[in-house]
């Protein structure tokens, strides 16, 4: 029984306090003194008016709401507030006097103008909101209606009323005002009472929002409601708290927060709070609070909060069930015949149905929770711990964030303490979680009707709990007269007589004491255990065969104990792999425990090693997130198994299993301790019952009394039931017995912890240990790594900065154990005396154990070493040498799964045992797989030293010994990863020496120290200048170029030039690029004389060598001018080759010979160069052979010269030339004008003018130009644009941002200045379907020259309209972006470890790298520039410094537009010209020099090769080289095997003497050139040749740049573990290698022709070559067998092609032939995808790799010839009128512009041509009129005639549009001829 009301309070407006805000004060309170058991709530006046005490000018309705207050003991107090407004006349004294005077004068009483609030407050510990509303309403009614009832009686009756708490009883009572009220108590006080609040909350916010709030509360987030109704706030908070039942909210719960306490919202603790909507402006700044708007029906979740959702499938099931309950009409909404009426449940029942859904949810979440309760003590109070890790593990939700947070919260801790005891009152949830969970699961899997039925059953019980008596007694409560609050004259609420009320209260209390009712006895019972914990996800779909794996583990253990070493070695790898599964680990512990019970724990050395390895393997997966079951089961086994080291010394297994983080995890020790204590308590009470009561009371105890199957919870329930009946002495004995049990167990665990934490050797070196990642002593889950002896000293104590010693280790272990003892003993109720005695005991235990271990360690070192595999030395390249001693290592698996078997199947090649070798060129691992089944194979993984991008020290889980060891992880730019763990015999000094040597060869002091200059050479080393030896950076200033070159002994430059004094201007190349890398700037100054225009005799030798360079040979091929003085130049030449830069005085990063306009003098080039970064002025690089458009490249503009560029139309009125800047700007203008003059000649010859619109570009101006061509009005040439949001892209915003990626550039024919629009990266989803939408963004004319420059530099440029030149602003990605993208690409393709997140897939990682996005932009820009040049416009590219993106784009444009560059010779010339001569910074970008050591690898050249690979994929017949050639270049441009890519420019190569070579003197040559190497290979083998090569003379290639068409380059992924990378091989195999191959060949013949091919191990294209390569190899083999001279493969290939043509001609003579005899056309149409050729290993090259088609494809070639007969430019159906019978028949017509024919066939599938019209004979193509017999329904305009010299052909198309198209096509074909 309890008081209905603890306090009644009257609170009114405080007139005494002044200020802007009003205040309230307590006018009266009853009782006047505090109850002893219930203190008076402080600050009640704040909560009466949560919005503040404010006066009102209106008469307001009385309001009612309930405020919930929580006291210091966490008890709730419900404050019901009824507020009404009183007329307030006496505001100020003067006003009152004035009003009284007026009343006397007028004789009238004036109505009040101001009203003050007054609150009647009822404070109670009971939650009866409707009773409170009725009681306060009754008091207000008595006051407002002036009833003849004493308020004093009402209040005293209210305060003294006694009501039952729970149990479902009813009580009638009256306050004495004619009222009759009924209190209905709920059946269970543990079940929340909600009324209709839950249903109301779902109506206000909806299902999804309420579920979000539900998750937020359970995961301890802050939730804030706001509404304009205080009652709604209270209901919402009540509903949300009720939804989390059976949990109880244990954080601040304030349904209505007063305005004065809003700062509470900034508290760091979670809360549920409600505030009035008037405070919205003050709550929106809260960053970590989830705000729910009850009136608007929305919730706002801040970005910083990640809400953990309910785990699936529970979330889906809950949403479906809520939808069933709240929206029952959904089921019949689609019915054709809707039911007459759908029964709508009452809102009170609906409320309970919604709660039933959440009850079902919690029953499923907490299913089996009682099986994870750990009972530590029973008496005097039960102490229960929850095994959270076991629960999560068994439920399969270890990684689930939601449940982890729920179980870690305070609410769940209260749930365990309240519901953990096995003997207590039970409620609805206990029954549900124990018996109904399986039914819930079945219902969810079957149909909705069963779900709804169960929900309604639960709802009925919840409803019955709130309304236990269906027949309610009659209630009567007087209510105020309607509108009574609007009365004009109302007397104020009268003040009650305090003494009278107090007397009446005392009288009532006396009566209650006389008739006191006994409290309701709680009915306790044994809590049912319920169903066990099961996984929340059905695991029926598991692919693993657990039974077979368990059998493997059992057999292996059996072989170990039976000492069958051979069988053990065979099964051990499989058993270790099986131990990855939990069931196998459980099996291991059970089997080992059986052998311990059989006293077979003493093992020999071999058995001991096997058992320890299996233990370590089982332990390595027991991380902090698991349930620790395996580790706890292995704990006693590790202290049982041992081996004898000597007569008196034994070594236990625990000394060898210390390398696991689980032992350093305090949570593990606590959980294991509590589990063992629980078992000991169970044994204690089982023993007590069997011993004491078994004989005397056998019948009373029954069958279960001595049943060993009884759980500890069963025993505890019985003990708790009997506890009140026991005597004090017996109770005290039980308490002491339990404490002794806990104390003895604490001593036992202290010993166990000493065993596992004290290392075998405290003086062990630190090689295999690293510092802890966290505070070890805090019990974190950081992995503690140590040596095989188990030293964890560094991790134990992070406080001391001194070196670890034995004493430090002992102290650290003591501190760790002491903290553990303190925690578990305090929680277990152990007395302080026992805890102190344990503290004294621990140091002694540690000291004794350390002393014991000294002998063990001493004896263990005398054991003979384990026999290890023999180290196999790898084959080396010519000139390659070993640098240091090989390190024995274990090659550990990385994140790639291919070689590890597992889910992908295949052999377990990794891990492999072997050695790591360091040579002058590579790091090589060579070894054998540890798995005995593939142990005969050889594993090789190698990395060129120069390509290493990162090496770091790591801790590796040794897969052989299952312990942590130090390792090394080496990542390479060749997409390789070497991850090794060092063997025990490898000392720290050996590792340090290895790393020092590695860094020495990674960054050699000089390029002549690189492997490229040492490979197989016997010439003496060249002595470089001293300054070169001191400064490894090549950014030095050479006094004269000649000195460096002469010292290198490579070339002779004119002596006059060397000896001449400096007379020229000193030019400085100062890189001032904005936003670029400082590392990209070159700060070298030119101190050399500027040579004159005529060549001196002494420089002829230099010129002779320069003209042999690739640049000049390409200039000659393109007819770009000659090197001659002005008197001998041809006037027809518009460009010339200047030798001004032959000594690199003009620009150090440019080649010696440059192509410039004919009219520009050499003297002006110096000034022009100043306007560009690093003096890289624009020069001609290539000319389109068809349109004569030229491609120019240069560096970006200097910002200071941009301002003065083309300021006005009149260039002669520029600033005077006295200033260096102004003169440079003038020369720049002149240079550009000269370029335009030279370009315009060809541009006009192509039929272009400044105002014409190219039809091929499909440009149609949006509006007519208002100014003429010669207009003097200055116009912006940069068109309007839409800014893109992509940062750091090649083209963001500017003119680019208006266009999105179209389907294919070839077909769209988009206008010319949509360039950068296609480069917008993140808008690829948008595709314009109408060209008019694009043209509104484009220029209205085509210019002769387009200058592509940086947007930042070109902003504000203004040009004369007549210049016929336009700027195109481009934004490009900086170097930092490319680096980042490459790193992400490397991590995606070559991950270092398996991803922990299941969502981290390979494709997702590739997408996040944005590598394809960058490739897309480069190709797209190149395609558009190529289109511009095809249309006759020239292009100048001046981006960044001119050596990165510029080089990529310029090279790709030439590949697209010139077939020559798609040959082997042409591609070589392109690389030499654009990349080497024009100064791409290979040394810096590839991180090859010491100066670039900190800059990182930037894959500019690799991106270019990837772009070429993408084009090669789309046009496989257009390239002479195959994709293997590209991979070969990609590998060796960073390998340092060849000298080609070593330096940054021709200037540096000249300075180092490597630019020119004396071909006559072979001994003086240094280093190998990659091009010569490739040429020699190509003469002998077809490894670089593309069998599909069939070039055409059509227009430029137009590849699609859409990301969807780009393909992953296999270079990033492929691996050949049998031989290492297939790019390092030698041309001539040695005799030894040849004999090896012969032996292996004979062996293969004996075994048969079948061979297993493993993609990650074998070179598939070598062991399984295509048909053509196979046939060529066979021919070569037969020639050798017949002792014939081998024929060159090129001749053989040509003969084969001729034979194919002859066969095709014969087949063509047969009219019934169904197959077209044309190989090339077949290749073009089908785009056959052929695999690349691979290369052999370093031992042999006879088995040439594949190049083209496989065997199935090769059989098709006999049907095709290479005749070009099937070129189809346009095709379709036309009706043709017969010549003889004049009949109209449909025919399939093909227009062939190559053969100049119009052929026709019977149908589109027909391959036999029925006839053709020679277009050379066509005279006219004209529209025609319909004739007799024409096809029906034909359009009159669909007819046209083709008149030839022989006859007139009549045609009819399908419609007028098609007819016009055919006429245009034929007309264009005729005009082009």
Swiss-Prot record:
Residues 1105-1613 form the Myotubularin phosphatase domain. Transmembrane segments: none annotated. The keyword Glycosyltransferase does not apply. Keywords: Autophagy, Cytoplasm, Guanine-nucleotide releasing factor, Membrane. Pfam families: DENN, GRAM, Myotub-related, PH, SBF2, uDENN. It comes from the Eukaryota. Residues 1077-1089 have a biased composition (Acidic residues). Residues 1767-1871 form the PH domain. It is found in: Cytoplasm; Membrane. It is a peripheral membrane protein. Residues 190-323 form the cDENN domain. Residues 325-426 form the dDENN domain. Its main location: cytoplasm. One of its GO terms (cellular component) is cytoplasm. GO terms for molecular function: guanyl-nucleotide exchange factor activity. GO terms for biological process: autophagy. Residues 7-171 form the uDENN domain. Residues 1064-1102 are annotated as: Disordered. The keyword Cytoplasm applies. Residues 869-955 form the GRAM domain. PROSITE patterns: DENN (PS50211), PH_DOMAIN (PS50003), PPASE_MYOTUBULARIN (PS51339). Belongs to the protein-tyrosine phosphatase family. Non-receptor class myotubularin subfamily. Guanine nucleotide exchange factor (GEF) which may activate Rab small GTPases. Promotes the exchange of GDP to GTP, converting inactive GDP-bound Rab proteins into their active GTP-bound form. Acts as an adapter for the phosphatase mtmr2. This is Myotubularin-related protein 13. It comes from Xenopus laevis (African clawed frog).
């Amino acid at each position: 029984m309890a008081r209905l009301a603890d306090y009644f309070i009257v609170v009114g407006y405080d007139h005494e306090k002044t200020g802007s805000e009003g205040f309230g004060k307590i006018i009266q309170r009853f009782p006047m003194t505090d109850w002893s058991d219930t203190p008076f709530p402080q600050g009640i006046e704040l909560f009466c008016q949560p919005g503040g005490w404010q006066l009102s000018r209106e008469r307001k309705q009385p309001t009612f709401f309930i405020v919930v207050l929580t006291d210091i003991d966490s008890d709730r107090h419900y404050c019901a507030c009824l507020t009404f407004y009183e007329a307030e006349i006496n505001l100020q004294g003067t006003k009152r006097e004035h009003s009284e005077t007026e009343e006397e004068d007028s004789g009238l009483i004036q109505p009040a103008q101001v009203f003050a609030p007054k609150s009647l407050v009822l404070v109670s510990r009971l939650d009866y909101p409707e009773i409170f509303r009725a009681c306060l309403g009754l008091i207000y009614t008595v006051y407002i209606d002036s009833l003849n009832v004493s308020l004093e009686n009402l209040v005293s009756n209210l305060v003294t009323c006694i009501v039952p708490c729970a149990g479902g009883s009813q009580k009638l009572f009256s306050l004495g005002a004619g009222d009759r009220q009924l209190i209905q108590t709920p059946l269970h006080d543990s079940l929340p009472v909600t009324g209709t609040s839950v249903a109301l909350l779902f109506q206000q916010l909806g299902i999804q929002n309420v579920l979000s709030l539900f998750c937020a509360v359970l995961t301890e987030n802050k939730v804030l409601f706001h509404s304009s109704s205080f009652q709604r706030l209270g209901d919402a908070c009540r509903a949300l708290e009720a939804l989390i039942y059976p949990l109880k909210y244990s954080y601040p719960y304030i349904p209505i927060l007063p305005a004065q306490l809003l700062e509470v919202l900034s508290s760091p603790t979670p809360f549920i709070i409600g505030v009035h909507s008037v405070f919205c402006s003050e709550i929106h700044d809260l960053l970590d609070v989830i705000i729910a708007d009850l009136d608007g029906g929305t919730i706002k979740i801040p970005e910083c909060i990640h809400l953990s959702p309910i785990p699936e499938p529970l979330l889906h099931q809950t949403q479906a069930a809520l939808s069933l309950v709240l929206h029952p009409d959904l089921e019949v909404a689609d019915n054709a015949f809707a039911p007459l009426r759908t029964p709508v449940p009452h809102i009170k029942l609906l409320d309970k149905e919604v709660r039933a859904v959440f009850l079902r949810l919690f029953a499923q979440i907490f299913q089996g929770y009682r099986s994870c309760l750990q009972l530590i003590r029973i008496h005097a109070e039960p102490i229960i711990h929850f095994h959270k890790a076991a629960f999560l593990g068994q439920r399969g939700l270890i990684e689930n964030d939601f449940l982890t947070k729920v179980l870690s919260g305070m609410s769940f801790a209260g749930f365990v303490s309240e519901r953990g005891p096995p003997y207590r009152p039970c409620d609805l949830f206990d029954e549900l979680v124990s018996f109904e969970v399986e039914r819930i699961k079945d219902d969810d899997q079957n149909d909705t009707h069963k779900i709804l039925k169960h929900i309604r059953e639960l709802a009925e019980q919840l409803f019955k709990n709130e309304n236990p008596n269906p027949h309610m007694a009659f209630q009567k409560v007087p209510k105020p007269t309607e509108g009574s609050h609007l009365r004009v004259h109302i007397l104020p609420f009268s003040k009650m007589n305090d003494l009278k009320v107090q007397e009446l209260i005392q009288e009532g209390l006396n009566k209650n004491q006389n008739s006191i009712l006994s409290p309701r006895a709680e009915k306790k019972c044994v809590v049912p255990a319920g169903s066990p914990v099961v996984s929340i996800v059905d695991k029926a779909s598991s692919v693993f065969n657990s039974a077979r794996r368990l059998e493997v583990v059992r057999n292996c253990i059996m072989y170990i104990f039976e000492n069958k070493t051979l069988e053990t070695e065979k099964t051990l790898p499989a058993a270790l792999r099986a131990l990855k599964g939990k069931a196998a680990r459980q099996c291991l512990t059970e089997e080992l425990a059986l052998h311990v019970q059989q006293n077979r724990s003493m093992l020999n050395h071999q058995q001991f090693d096997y058992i320890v390895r299996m233990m370590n393997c089982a332990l390595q997966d027991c991380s902090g997130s698991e349930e620790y079951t395996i580790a706890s089961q292995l704990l006693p086994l590790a202290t049982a198994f041992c081996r004898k080291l000597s007569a008196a010394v034994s070594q236990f297994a625990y000394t060898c299993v210390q390398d696991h983080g689980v032992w350093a995890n305090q949570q593990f020790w606590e959980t294991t301790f509590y589990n063992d204590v629980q078992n000991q308590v169970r044994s204690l009470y089982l023993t007590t019952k069997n011993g004491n009561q078994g004989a005397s009371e056998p019948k009373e105890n029954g069958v279960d009394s001595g049943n060993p199957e009884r759980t500890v919870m069963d025993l505890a329930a019985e003990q708790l039931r009997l506890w009140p009946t026991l005597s004090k002495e017996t109770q005290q004995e039980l308490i002491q017995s339990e404490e002794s049990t806990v104390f003895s167990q604490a001593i036992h665990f202290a010993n166990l912890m000493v065993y596992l934490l004290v290392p075998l050797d405290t003086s062990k070196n630190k090689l295999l240990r690293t510092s802890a990642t966290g505070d070890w002593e805090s019990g974190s889950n950081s992995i503690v790594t140590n040596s095989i002896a188990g030293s964890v000293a560094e991790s134990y104590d992070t406080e001391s900065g001194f070196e670890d010693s034995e004493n430090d280790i002992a102290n650290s272990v003591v501190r760790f154990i002491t903290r553990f003892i303190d925690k578990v003993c305090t929680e277990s109720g152990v007395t302080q005396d026992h805890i102190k005695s344990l503290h004294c005991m621990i140091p002694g235990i540690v000291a004794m154990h350390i002393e014991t271990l000294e002998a063990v360690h001493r004896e263990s070192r005398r054991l003979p070493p384990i026999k290890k595999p023999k180290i196999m030395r790898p084959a080396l390249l010519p000139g390659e040498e070993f640098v240091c001693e090989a390190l024995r290592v274990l090659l550990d698996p990385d994140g790639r799964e291919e070689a590890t078997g597992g889910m992908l199947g295949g052999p377990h090649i990794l891990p492999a045992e072997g050695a790591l070798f360091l040579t002058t060129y590579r790091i090589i691992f060579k070894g054998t797989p540890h798995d005995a089944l593939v142990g005969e194979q050889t594993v090789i993984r190698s990395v060129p030293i120069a390509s290493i991008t990162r090496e770091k020290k790591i801790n590796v889980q040794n897969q052989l010994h299952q312990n942590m060891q130090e390792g090394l992880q080496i990542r390479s730019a060749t997409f390789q990863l070497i991850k090794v763990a060092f063997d025990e015999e490898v000392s720290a000094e050996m590792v340090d020496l290895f790393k020092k040597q590695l860094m020495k060869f990674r960054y050699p002091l000089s390029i002549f120290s690189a492997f490229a200059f040492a490979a197989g050479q016997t010439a003496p080393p060249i002595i470089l200048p001293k300054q070169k030896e001191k400064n490894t950076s090549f950014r030095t200033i050479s006094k004269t170029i000649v000195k460096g070159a002469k010292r290198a002994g490579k070339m002779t430059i004119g002596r006059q030039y060397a000896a001449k004094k400096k007379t020229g201007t000193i030019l400085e190349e100062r890189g001032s690029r904005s936003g670029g890398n400082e590392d990209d700037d070159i700060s070298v100054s030119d101190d050399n004389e500027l040579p004159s225009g005529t060549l001196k005799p002494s420089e002829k030798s230099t010129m002779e060598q320069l003209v042999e360079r690739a640049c000049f040979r390409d200039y000659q091929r393109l007819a770009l001018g000659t090197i001659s003085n002005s008197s001998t130049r041809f006037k027809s030449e518009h460009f010339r080759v200047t030798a001004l830069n032959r000594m690199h005085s003009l620009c150090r990063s440019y080649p010696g010979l440059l192509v410039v306009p004919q009219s520009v003098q050499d003297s002006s080039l110096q000034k022009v160069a100043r306007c560009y970064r690093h003096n890289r002025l624009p020069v001609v690089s290539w000319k389109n052979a068809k349109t004569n458009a030229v491609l120019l490249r240069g560096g970006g503009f200097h910002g200071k010269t941009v301002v003065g560029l083309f300021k006005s139309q009149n260039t002669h009125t520029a600033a005077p030339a006295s200033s260096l800047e102004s003169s440079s700007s003038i020369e720049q203008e002149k240079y550009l004008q000269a370029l335009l003059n030279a370009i315009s000649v060809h541009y006009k010859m192509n039929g272009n003018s400044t105002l014409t619109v190219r039809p091929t570009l499909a440009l149609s101006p949006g509006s007519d130009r208002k100014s003429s061509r010669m207009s003097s009005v200055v116009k912006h040439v940069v068109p309007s644009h839409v800014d893109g949001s992509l940062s750091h892209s090649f083209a963001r915003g500017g003119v680019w941002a208006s266009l999105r990626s179209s389907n294919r550039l070839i077909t769209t024919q988009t206008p010319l200045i949509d360039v950068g629009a296609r480069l917008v990266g993140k808008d690829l989803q948008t595709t314009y379907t109408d060209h008019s939408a694009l043209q509104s963004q484009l220029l209205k004319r085509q210019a002769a020259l387009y200058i592509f420059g940086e947007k930042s530099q070109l902003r504000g440029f203004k040009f004369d309209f007549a210049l016929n030149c336009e700027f195109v602003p481009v934004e490009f990605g900086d170097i930092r972006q490319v680096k980042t993208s490459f790193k992400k690409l490397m991590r995606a393709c070559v991950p270092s470890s398996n991803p922990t997140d299941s969502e981290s897939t390979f494709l997702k990682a590739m997408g996040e790298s944005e590598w394809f996005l960058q490739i897309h932009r480069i190709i797209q820009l190149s395609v558009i520039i190529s289109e511009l040049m095809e249309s006759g416009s020239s292009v100048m590219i001046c981006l960044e410094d001119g050596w990165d993106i510029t080089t990529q784009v310029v090279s790709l444009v030439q590949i697209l537009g010139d077939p020559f560059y798609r040959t082997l010779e042409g591609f070589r010339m392109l690389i030499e010209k654009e990349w080497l001569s024009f100064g791409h910074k290979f040394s810096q970008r590839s991180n090859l020099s010491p100066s670039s050591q900190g800059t990182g690898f930037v894959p500019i050249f690799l991106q270019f090769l990837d772009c070429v690979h993408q084009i090669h994929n789309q046009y496989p017949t257009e390239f002479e080289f195959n994709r293997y050639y590209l991979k070969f270049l990609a590998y060796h441009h960073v390998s340092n095997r060849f000298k080609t890519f070593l330096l940054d420019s021709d200037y540096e190569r000249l300075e180092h003497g490597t630019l020119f070579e004396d071909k006559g003197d072979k001994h003086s040559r240094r280093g190998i050139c990659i091009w010569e190497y490739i040429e020699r290979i190509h003469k002998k083998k077809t490894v670089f040749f593309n069998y599909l090569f069939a070039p055409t003379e059509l227009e430029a290639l137009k590849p699609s740049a859409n990301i969807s068409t780009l393909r992953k380059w296999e270079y990033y992924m492929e691996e050949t573990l049998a031989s290492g990378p297939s790019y390092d091989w030698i041309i001539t195999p040695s005799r030894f290698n040849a004999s090896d191959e012969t032996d292996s060949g004979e062996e293969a013949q004996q075994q048969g022709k079948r061979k297993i091919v493993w993609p990650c191990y074998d070179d598939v294209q070598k062991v399984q070559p295509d048909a053509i390569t196979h046939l060529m190899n066979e021919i070569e083999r037969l020639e050798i067998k017949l002792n014939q001279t081998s024929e060159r493969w090129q001749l053989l290939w040509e003969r084969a092609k001729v034979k194919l043509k002859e066969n095709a001609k014969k087949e063509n003579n047969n009219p019934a032939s169904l197959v077209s005899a044309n190989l090339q056309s077949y290749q073009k149409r089908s785009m056959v995808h052929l695999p690349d050729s691979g290369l052999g290993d370093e031992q042999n090259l006879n088995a040439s790799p594949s190049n083209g088609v496989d065997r199935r494809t090769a059989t098709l070639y006999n049907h095709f010839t290479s005749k070009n007969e099937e070129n189809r430019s346009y095709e379709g159906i036309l009706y043709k009128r017969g010549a003889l019978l004049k009949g109209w028949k449909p025919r399939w017509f093909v227009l062939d512009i190559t053969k100049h024919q119009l052929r026709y066939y019977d149908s589109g599938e027909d391959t036999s041509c029925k006839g053709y019209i020679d277009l050379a004979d066509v005279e006219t193509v004209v529209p025609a009129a319909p004739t007799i017999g024409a096809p029906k329904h034909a359009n009159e305009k669909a007819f046209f005639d083709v008149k030839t010299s022989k006859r007139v052909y009549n045609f009819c198309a399908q419609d007028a549009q098609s007819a016009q198209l055919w006429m245009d096509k034929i007309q264009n074909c005729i005009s082009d001829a």
